[in-house]
């Protein structure tokens, strides 16, 4: 469901795939070839939420914030992520079930591990690997991680295009 909130209307690029089981409301911008999967809630009632190009927001995730939220290009937000971040840099991956609290800034090409919890206003440098509760930087992203992140994002772009054009995956 896509809804206006007062004079705030979601702006969704025509190439983006939005599941009919997602809920998007308010001042939201979704870039080209991005995808929003079933059960996802994107609620921009306190500030604007901008999602870049080629980004995927997977099933049952929530994006909301106390202020503006900027999600970069080629970002993967895994299943059941609670994301209140101020910024998620290009090419980053937030693992399944992670929690990113208000005001956090995640640098480009970083990995937030599944189940990790990023505390309020935490700043994660580019190409960091963060694990645990609370999240701690455990190392730097390697070339194999970057390739994995690109492969996941491109796979979801392709899958979103298939869903958009056919309504189902070809097996």
What are these regions (language model features)?
Residues 1-11, 45-48, 53, 59-60, ...:
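Glycine-rich hexapeptide-repeat left-handed beta-helix
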Residues 7, 12-65:
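A positional/architectural concept
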Residues 69:
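Residues that scaffold, gate, or flank divalent-cation-dependent active/transport sites
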